Amino acid sequence: MKYVVTGGAGFIGSHLIEKLVKQGDVVTVLDNLNTGKIENLKPVSKKINFVQNDIRDFEVLRSLMENVDGVFHQAAMASVQDSFRIPEKFHDVNVNGTENIFKIAKEFGIKVVYASSSSVYGDTSILPTTESDEKRPINPYAKTKLEKDKLADQYAKNGLKVIGLRYFNVFGPRQSKEYAGVIKLFLERIQQGLPPLVNGDGLQIRDFVHVDDAVNANILSMESDIDFEFFNIGTDTTISVLDLANMIIKFSGLELKPIHRPPVPGDVKTTEADITKAKMMLKWKPATSIENWLKSAVLDVKNNL
């Protein structure tokens, strides 16, 4: 199969490309490298076609998407803090850029699987959260993700095959600081022999899902016969940010205590995914637990000290 992957030099996109190449698929990668890193593509650099450009460039997108079987749309501006500072640019990239992809995909009759976000639910009291629960985004970034979902709904009614994956807190190798990378930040502090820095009281609850599981959800969505749907991509299990920090400290064997900082504006208090629909319709389920992965990651950090 032939695919375009937008945002392919980023965290999730680069892992997705590796899996597609391993399957024998032909992959074209589009990334403007604003936050993506070309070194993320090093393992597959000789097996892909890389184009440095922007999803807002309609004609470039159109030329790349002609004669492919599908598009994995991972490109986005993702920093919640930056979204308060430059909301117009976030809308332009995340919403207008996505609509370009939907328009062209509809024209060519190809399927799109794209990155949505659990942030569309906002601070909900309904836990675990299902795909049909109320959407109350609390920051400009999350609002752009909800607008993308509304566009998907609109284009699906006009014949586009499109699946939106509402990622919860994805973690794993190559995670960027921009991508809500609390685990990466904590591990970097431990590597320096320093205590993790926790925003606010640390009682924020998170549902962490490994990047390999997110990749599998993308591929299952593309290969499925489902024409239009939204799926939560999480684990049905949660941990507080403070407990996460203490777990990393425990695995490190260092005598440290987390340092608390002021809370961050736009930070959702609790996220927990109900993944029943993804399990039933995609036959998908997460395979990597955060605790097991962290034990290995902290060991790697200690070995590199």
Regions found by a protein language model. Give the residues of each.
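Hydrophobic alpha-helix immediately C-terminal to the catalytic Tyr-X-X-X-Lys motif of short-chain
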Residues: 147, 151, 155, 186, ...
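Glycine/proline-rich active-site loop of Rossmann-fold NAD(P)-dependent oxidoreductases
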Residues: 146, 161, 170-185, 194-195, ...
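Non-catalytic, hydrophobic alpha-helical segments
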Residues: 214, 218, 233, 244, ...
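Amphipathic terminal alpha-helices
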Residues: 290-305
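PAPS/PAP-binding and catalytic site of the sulfotransferase fold
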Residues: 240-252, 293
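Conserved C-terminal active-site "lid" loop/helix of NAD(P)H-dependent oxidoreductases
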Residues: 211, 261-286, 296
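N-terminal Rossmann-like NAD(P)+-binding domain of SDR-like oxidoreductases, especially those catalyzing
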Residues: 1-170, 284, 297
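Generic structural signal for alpha-helix termini and adjacent loop/cap motifs
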Residues: 15, 86, 104, 124, ...
